[in-house]
């Protein structure tokens, strides 16, 4: 069980509050000028392949000392131990939180209610391996005897975002199968996907633990109807559909052979499920051996997280710096900015991972918190973002801490593209940290031949204040293993922050109310009768919708 410790009542929080009075005027230029070893002191290496540079943050030794004290005073270590031991730390649902067991490559026992889960984890992995090898190798045939060419993953939330992000990130490792992902209940998503596939050579993966998720099952039945228009015989469904589920009865009723049902467990949260059977689409895209490398990379980070003192623990350091900005500097958002086109869904994935985990206003005692919890997470790949929203990060009025992520080695050595990409990666964090003074702007304008009047008019607009904080995460190359490292790093960062904020990070009750109301409204949309059962706004919207569609 997790302890209930209000972070604001700790001595460390009070010390941080006092420290902030002077630290809010901290200047990155001065910090670097005062300490030639700042980069060495405020950076960390993970193995041989990842460098995390957090030196361009508004922190000094005293800041970090108080932050580490906060982690200790909120008993973070016992929370880490409780999670990895399989205690029911998802207390509102009385569940263990063991996505880490899915990638436990040491195969050491992991107990839930006294039972080792590893034999079951390994059995599902072996089943996925055998299935994927038949599909990839062409042994698995469709209803006309043709091999599979396309795979459509039907899921939503964690059953979609994770597999989609990973398959996109690892395109350099993909095989001949073409992957498609359908999530939105908007029929357009499925309709446009079906235009690009052939019923004779398409395999559908229906990803729903309960096999009752409204969006997923609506899309699955649409895919089934489309398929049967071509195949005719319902017996053929079993050759073109597999299930990632635990509801054997519903899976069989759909027409799927339960031998092709891949289970996972209630101790696997949706947003942490890519490591489970939900990752079957990843295996079908990159092959089982590369999936194992992904698991191994995450396991390496798990071991680092469990065994490394907080002062050198990368997820802990990143989490604490995030708390410094969120709770003391008043930052409301964080940007994740990968300088790698293959990582174009990375920020979206951790938008869910972070905001669904820590978007909570009630603490573990059931009381409203009196402090800020989860930040808004957003971002796009560089350099696209530079020509879209970096203006606000550089010269806006909001403090937006940023994570810059880039590989040193590209999978596509096209001309000098990668050098140009990386020059921007390095330049942006330097510009954000150190800015450009009025004197430097004036000198530039004088050199350009501007008049004194023109210079006076332009200088204020061309000054960069700097002092915008960033982390730089430099990866040797994006591989299955290093991607596993990165994903687990961010997962554990989120966990650490939730522990310190005294909230439950592994439930998501905030998604329930809208679903309940949608189920009430759905039958009201079946006819043209005026609706009066809601507030005036909702009634007005529903009735306008009915009038528009008439």
Swiss-Prot record:
<dbReference type="InterPro" id="IPR001672">
    <property type="entry name" value="G6P_Isomerase"/>
</dbReference>
<dbReference type="GO" id="GO:0006094">
    <property type="term" value="P:gluconeogenesis"/>
</dbReference>
<dbReference type="GO" id="GO:0006096">
    <property type="term" value="P:glycolytic process"/>
</dbReference>
<keyword id="KW-0963">Cytoplasm</keyword>
<dbReference type="GO" id="GO:0051156">
    <property type="term" value="P:glucose 6-phosphate metabolic process"/>
</dbReference>
<dbReference type="InterPro" id="IPR046348">
    <property type="entry name" value="SIS_dom_sf"/>
</dbReference>
<dbReference type="GO" id="GO:0005829">
    <property type="term" value="C:cytosol"/>
</dbReference>
<comment type="function">
    <text>Catalyzes the reversible isomerization of glucose-6-phosphate to fructose-6-phosphate.</text>
</comment>
<dbReference type="GO" id="GO:0004347">
    <property type="term" value="F:glucose-6-phosphate isomerase activity"/>
</dbReference>
<dbReference type="GO" id="GO:0048029">
    <property type="term" value="F:monosaccharide binding"/>
</dbReference>
<dbReference type="InterPro" id="IPR023096">
    <property type="entry name" value="G6P_Isomerase_C"/>
</dbReference>
<comment type="similarity">
    <text>Belongs to the GPI family.</text>
</comment>
<feature type="active site" description="Proton donor">
    <location>
        <position position="356"/>
    </location>
</feature>
<keyword id="KW-0324">Glycolysis</keyword>
<dbReference type="InterPro" id="IPR018189">
    <property type="entry name" value="Phosphoglucose_isomerase_CS"/>
</dbReference>
<comment type="pathway">
    <text>Carbohydrate degradation; glycolysis; D-glyceraldehyde 3-phosphate and glycerone phosphate from D-glucose: step 2/4.</text>
</comment>
<dbReference type="InterPro" id="IPR035482">
    <property type="entry name" value="SIS_PGI_2"/>
</dbReference>
<feature type="active site">
    <location>
        <position position="387"/>
    </location>
</feature>
<feature type="active site">
    <location>
        <position position="515"/>
    </location>
</feature>
<comment type="pathway">
    <text>Carbohydrate biosynthesis; gluconeogenesis.</text>
</comment>
<dbReference type="GO" id="GO:0097367">
    <property type="term" value="F:carbohydrate derivative binding"/>
</dbReference>
<keyword id="KW-0413">Isomerase</keyword>
<dbReference type="Pfam" id="PF00342">
    <property type="entry name" value="PGI"/>
</dbReference>
<keyword id="KW-0312">Gluconeogenesis</keyword>
<dbReference type="InterPro" id="IPR035476">
    <property type="entry name" value="SIS_PGI_1"/>
</dbReference>
<protein>
    <recommendedName>
        <fullName>Glucose-6-phosphate isomerase</fullName>
        <ecNumber>5.3.1.9</ecNumber>
    </recommendedName>
</protein>
